[in-house]
């Protein structure tokens, strides 16, 4: 305690904080960290950094234009500058398609930047499979986490330098730039994947950064909040939004333009930081440098559905696999071809189904090319004609 009282007054002119300035000042500390990221400067003018491996997952939220995307870019560039491609791999999910797509070609990426929300859901499910695979490897080597595994592999490499089958395990950082878009497309699958990654993936060296500009409870659900202990709040419109992010007020009083409250895991009081800024020109120079040093080699299977991910995505909460066709599926296909049009409400009336079941069947018909895409409130057009159906049966 002190015998004085301090009152925070914002400066008339905001002084920008450059990423380069923070990295140069904290270079030694960052080199000793597993996953160092640059945050900015606190109210005393001290440069602030964080280690994602200790975070271990991070929620970034704030209203439009408050500085979220700049913060995400500074995190990515901190990792590109301080770590080699074999030390850390990035999975970037960018539903907005313009914010992170310029990182394509960087060797640190595990796969090309994911812009399709449906592919993003599949990518998250494949990350869960990678986590399970890593735990199997840990069990085989009798180690508890990625640090123990890499130490054991390093010792084996020193003993057998000619053995090319021994490799160190790289960290994986998954960055989602806009969670709200993913929750609209596949909220159940995305929420399940986030829950599994945040609960178990830390020891496997997989870390998650989730950003959203809609800090409402339908996006930042209880499951997401409970499993992501570290938070960054930028300026928001109301105290309710601040409570959704930080479980306390304060973010509604921030100034915007990178002014943030950082609440790391285990801390009760958030730290006020002026977030660092990185220009588009600097980002391009970092990308050009890293791309020149090494050719990118991507794993395209991350965004592709396989048998394992299909079983994850189609299993319900109670473990029931909904990948099997509905018992009425063939009858509904015949009905659709006869009538030439189909809708969820039509199936409800004709087959006496509940709305959820009818909507699932309509989605399945579209997925298999039986009916066309949604056209406002009109019934869906059937793409398979009667004579074609008869030919296939013959």
Model region roles, listed by residue range:
Residues 2-36, 41-43, 47-49, 54-55, ...:
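P-loop NTPase motor-domain active sites and their immediate coupling elements
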Residues 53, 80-118, 122-125, 223-224:
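P-loop NTPase switch/communication element
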Residues 58-59:
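Short hydrophobic/aromatic beta-strand immediately N-terminal to the Walker A/P-loop
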Residues 68:
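Conserved lysine of the Walker
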Residues 71, 75:
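Hydrophobic positions on the alpha1 helix immediately C-terminal to the Walker A/P-loop
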Residues 63-65, 212:
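The conserved Walker
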Residues 78-79, 130:
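Conserved short hydrophobic interaction patches
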């Amino acid at each position: 305690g002190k015998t004085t009282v301090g009152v925070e007054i914002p400066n008339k002119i905001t002084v920008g904080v450059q990423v380069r300035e923070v990295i140069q000042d904290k270079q030694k500390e960052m080199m000793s960290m597993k996953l160092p990221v640059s945050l900015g400067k606190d109210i005393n003018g001290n440069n602030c950094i964080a280690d994602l491996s200790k975070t271990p997952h991070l929620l970034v939220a704030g209203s439009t234009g408050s500085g979220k995307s700049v913060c995400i870019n500074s995190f990515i560039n901190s990792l590109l500058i301080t770590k080699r491609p074999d030390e850390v791999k990035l999975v970037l999910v960018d539903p907005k398609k313009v914010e992170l797509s310029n990182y394509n070609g960087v060797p640190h990426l595990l796969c090309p930047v994911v812009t399709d929300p449906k592919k993003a859901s599949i990518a998250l499910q494949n990350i869960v499979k990678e986590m399970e695979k890593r735990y199997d490897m840990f069990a085989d080597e009798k180690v508890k986490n990625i640090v123990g595994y890499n130490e054991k592999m390093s010792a084996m490499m020193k003993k057998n330098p000619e053995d090319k089958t021994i490799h160190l395990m790289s960290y994986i950082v998954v960055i989602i730039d806009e969670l709200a878009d993913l929750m609209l497309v596949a909220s159940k699958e995305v929420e399940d994947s986030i829950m599994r990654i945040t609960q178990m993936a830390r020891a496997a060296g997989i870390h998650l950064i989730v950003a959203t500009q809609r800090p409402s409870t339908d996006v930042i659900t209880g499951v997401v909040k409970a499993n992501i202990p570290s938070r960054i709040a930028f300026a928001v419109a109301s105290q309710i939004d601040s409570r959704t992010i930080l479980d306390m007020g304060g973010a509604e009083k921030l100034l915007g333009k990178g002014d943030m409250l950082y609440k790391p895991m285990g801390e009760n009081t958030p730290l006020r930081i002026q977030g660092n800024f990185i220009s588009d020109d600097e980002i391009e120079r970092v990308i050009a440098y890293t791309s020149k040093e090494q050719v990118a080699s991507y794993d395209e299977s991350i965004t592709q559905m396989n048998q394992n991910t299909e079983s994850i995505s189609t299993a319900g909460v109670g473990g029931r696999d909904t990948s099997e066709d509905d018992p009425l599926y063939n009858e509904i296909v015949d009905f659709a071809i006869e009538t030439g049009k189909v809708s969820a409400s039509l199936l409800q009336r004709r087959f006496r189904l509940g709305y959820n079941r009818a909507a699932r069947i309509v989605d399945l018909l579209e997925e298999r090319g039986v009916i066309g895409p949604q056209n406002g409130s009109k019934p869906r057009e059937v793409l398979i004609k009667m004579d074609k159906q008869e030919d296939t049966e013959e």
